[in-house]
């Protein structure tokens, strides 16, 4: 009986560690890279603080609302044709500007017709060359995509969750500094949209800042989370990553198995021994990770630090795909749902992409089997994470086996084109010397420079020789005249 109890304890511990959905990192550039000593210190401070249960809530939306997300995409590129007829093209320079509510509303209603799954086509710059001249071309177009968001009722008023912020539906617009969101007012169901937890985590409050919560087994940190006022019977919270959860008292432990109480002293001692062994194992793994802090992603004090390039990251868990998900750029990007909000996931880096750019024709639909293959590639590409992302097992893809995702509708949006020209000499000799120009254009630029330089030296030498001979003849004639 004692053996059965012990086996059940260990099995439960392992099953709780693997969570639902894919986990990714959301990162910002930083110069703040912890030292190995600071990392070692965090290993001993991991489990200090009050224990608390975090229940991750599923997005069972009785009411969903179609939201348009807009931003101006500005692309600049220079095209140079040298005096040797070589053509040089610079790298694309892409910047972003916020769109106004009026601009976004126009695209939302006129182009996307208030429907989900709409995305604007990215415009490209058409090359244009002039001899001995550099031309700078710029294309600016309004990028819009529509997605569904969670809507809920609170005190008789509808709210929509956008990037972890509860916005009144009656406002019909929101700007987070980068993107502009617009939507139409819709009637809201009175049913609580968050009733059934996806999973329960055993977590710890920070010993110094009780408002920060860390979940070691999942590698999740809940920092600067806020209350969401809803009609739900229990208090709901959301963090900056859009994760929706509730807090409660711990009735289990998913990191160290304190799940069975027994009057048998031997069983209690065995459980205590297992706990100590697991603590030692976690400590050893933590210290080993610290030694690799300059070479791979490392978890320190609630954040992940990626050394190449230096970035400070937060873990976003419970990402999954559904019938609204698509892939982009040959499967490199996946349009997924993370904590109730839509994000682009870069499967090569394991991070979210705030301003993703799909190549022309690069957006495609995907089946469940295809996505599982993409997911396997994700795990292979992100082996550098080591053991820190232990919640990246996907247990259920919402698609059925033979179901295919709807292909996103591509629309053309408002655009502006302009051309600015640098100083140069413009000589239209193309039509006259077209065959010779085409021949020269096929030669490497460096070879042409050398050839033209040698030719210039030869011509210069000939001119000097002619001048020398001319001067000598003139002097000879002067001498004859004097005689």
Swiss-Prot record:
Post-translational events: Glycosylatedby host. Glycosylation is crucial for glycoprotein export at the cell surface.
Virion surface compartment residues: 22-442
Residue ranges annotated as Intravirion topological domain: 464-483
Keyword Signal: yes
GO biological-process terms attached to the record: symbiont entry into host cell; virion attachment to host cell
Endpoints of the signal sequence: 1-21
Segments traversing the membrane: 443-463
Keyword Coiled coil: no
Bilayer topology term: Single-pass type I membrane protein
Keywords associated with the record: Glycoprotein, Host-virus interaction, Membrane, Signal, Transmembrane, Transmembrane helix, Viral attachment to host cell, Viral envelope protein, Virion, Virus entry into host cell
Subcellular location: Virion membrane
GO cellular component: membrane; viral envelope; virion membrane
Function: Attaches the virus to host cellular receptor, inducing endocytosis of the virion. In the endosome, the acidic pH induces conformational changes in the glycoprotein trimer, which trigger fusion between virus and cell membrane.
Family: Belongs to the cytorhabdovirus glycoprotein family.
Subunit annotation: Homotrimer. Interacts with matrix protein.
Protein name: Glycoprotein
Organism, scientific name: Northern cereal mosaic virus (NCMV)
